[in-house]
Swiss-Prot record:
Protein's name according to its UniProt entry: Probable peptidoglycan glycosyltransferase FtsW
Organism whose genome encodes this protein: Methylomonas methanica (strain DSM 25384 / MC09)
Keyword Cell division among record annotations: yes
Gene field: ftsW
Any GO CC annotation of this UniProt entry: plasma membrane
InterPro entries named in the record: FtsW, FtsW/RodA
């Protein structure tokens, strides 16, 4: 009798977090539809083509998903190894963008590098790098972070260099986001409450001084406090955004039927996309988007907790840092649009128009998916080991 043929080995499956995937695809889809709705008139003005911006955004999303697929294949141990050199690369990029003739200047700020036809906003790259760097630092120096204020100050000194370079662009909003990411990660990394609170007070004081040191920031603050008094100058953008939400009421005026995007509301397809959504989809659409971002943050923290329970501290901290970044930036963008916060110039993650930011954020989400996959595989291998 011939020997029995060996049983085929089961195909290896890449476990994807279905909840997180659904949320990301919904945000990308809603964002694309709203970018299309808010930019058609601009496409006619720029290129006599209503599909000019929607087509470019579709290309950005496809490139972002391709980049995410590549990032998904990188094990977390490699990110842990390259955290420090990656931070140096980030500082170099922040310096390069300030070189006259190299950095691309838009609306008075030099924040972009042109690469293969795409404008890469260096601050978005630096946010991701800061997450990886901080996760590596806290993992290596866990005792110092927990028991010494100098353990908290060391990485912040390096991040302050990045923040100064960002302020030179100027990009105050991104500098704030990076510091919030760092502080949040150190708190979740086990920093003692008393030195942490003292550090928060120090950084907040420094931020307040910086915010009041530039005339345009002071104007933003005064217009935020009473936008209707400055409705024709510094408060114009905010009042137009508030009008958008007022017109939208509960169910909106209908997709594509908004008026504020028609050259009344500046940056309607980028920083103020949420206002257009509020006008056209109303409270229903606004609530849906807030719920999606809330789900993303909650699910991201859950993945971080699973990684920490599995002993993968670096991966856990990266997960925490990524969701702090996405959650805080989304909160600030929506808060600015609704008049809760002063204007900051931050995009709505995975939704606003933009090539470089879309690619970076898709890549960042891929890292979160990778953490979930590795934790799931580790859990499966532990179960198999116990059953033997």
């Amino acid at each position: 009798m011939s020997a029995a043929a060996p049983k085929p080995r089961p195909a290896h499956r890449f476990h994807i977090d279905q909840t997180l995937l659904s949320v990301c695809l919904c945000l990308l889809g809603i964002g694309f539809v709203m970018v299309a709705s808010s930019s058609m008139h601009l496409g006619v003005k720029m290129a006599d083509d209503v599909s000019y911006y929607p087509f470019k955004q579709l290309v950005h999303i496809i490139l972002g998903l391709m980049f995410a697929a590549a990032i998904l294949a990188i094990p977390m141990k490699y990110w842990q190894k390259i955290g420090q050199p990656l931070f140096i690369v980030g500082l170099v990029l922040l310096l390069v963008v300030l070189i006259p003739g190299v950095g691309v200047k838009v609306n008075g700020s030099t924040r972009w590098l042109s690469l293969l036809g795409l404008r890469i906003q260096v601050s978005e790259v630096m946010k991701f790098i800061s997450v990886v760097y901080m996760a590596g630092y806290i993992t290596r120096h866990s005792d110092h972070v927990r028991h010494s204020i100098f353990g908290l100050l060391r990485p912040l000194m390096l991040l302050s260099v990045a923040s100064i370079l960002l302020l030179l662009e100027p990009d105050f909003g991104s500098a704030v986001v990076i510091l919030i990411i760092a502080m949040g990660m150190m708190f979740l990394g086990g920093a003692r409450l008393s030195p942490f609170v003292a550090l928060v007070a120090l950084i907040s004081s420094a931020g307040a001084i910086l915010a009041s040191s530039a005339d345009y920031r002071v104007k933003r603050m005064t217009s935020f406090l009473n936008p209707w008094e400055h409705a024709r100058d510094s408060g114009y953008q905010l009042t137009q955004a508030l009008i958008s939400f007022g017109r939208g009421e509960v169910s909106g005026v209908g997709l594509g039927n908004g008026l504020q995007k028609l050259f009344y509301l500046p940056e309607a397809h980028t920083d103020f996309l949420f206002s257009v959504l509020g006008e056209e989809l109303g409270l229903v659409g606004v609530t849906l988007v807030i719920a999606l971002f809330t789900t993303l943050v909650v699910r991201g923290f859950s993945i971080g907790e699973q990684a920490e329970a599995a002993g993968e501290r670096f991966s856990a901290l990266v997960a925490y840092g990524l969701v702090i970044w996405f959650g805080f930036q989304a909160f600030v963008n929506m808060g600015v649009n609704m008049g809760i916060l002063p204007t900051k110039g931050l995009t709505l993650p995975l939704m606003s128009y933009g090539g470089g930011s879309m690619i970076v954020m898709c890549g960042a989400m891929a890292v979160l998916f990778r953490i979930h996959y590795e934790v799931t595989e580790l859990h499966k291998s532990n179960i198999k080991g116990k059953s033997r």
